[in-house]
Amino acid sequence: MHQVLYYQSPIGVLKIKEENNCIVGVHLLTESEEISKTEVESKCSPLLIKACTQLTEYFAGERTSFSLPIKFTTGTPFQHSVWNALRNIPYGETRSYEDIAVAVGNPKAVRAIGQANHNNPVLLLVPCHRVINKNGSLGGFGCGVEIKKQLLQLEGVL
């Protein structure tokens, strides 16, 4: 069984999904997506409430790491290794796609790192926004480069 909570953040509405006491998804809704009335429950789980609290603290600049259980229910073993490596990038720091490729033991997989970032199911908690190009340019971001820039500014990187 899963529960969903919609959270209004400074970057837009985040859909947070929990399954079996683990966060399995944090997704930024696009303008064309709507809040699913069938998924909204009147009572939220303690974990979803904790997730909202921690996200509020993060966006207020009061939290630099998340202490929420995460489980990857999608993706390949390679993508899981990338997402776990991303969780080790500290707040206020960035790594290049090449750095992550080296960290997962596949230095030539730079493009695959970018694809894994694009498929990251747990936005913010798995900080794919902290991965930039080797030359220091921001690179891509599934939610748009402006949001990536906003998150890196929040963290004091830019």
Task: Please report, for each region that a protein language model flagged, where it lies by residue.
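Basic nucleic-acid-binding alpha-helical/helix-turn surface characteristic of O6-alkylguanine DNA
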Residues: 1-108, 154, 158
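Regulatory, non-catalytic segments
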Residues: 108-120
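…primarily DNA-binding HTH/wHTH and HhH modules…
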Residues: 135-158
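Short Lys/Arg-enriched helix C-cap and helix-to-coil transition segments
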Residues: 124-131
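Short clusters of hydrophobic/aromatic residues that line enzyme substrate/ligand-binding pockets
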Residues: 68-72, 113, 138-141
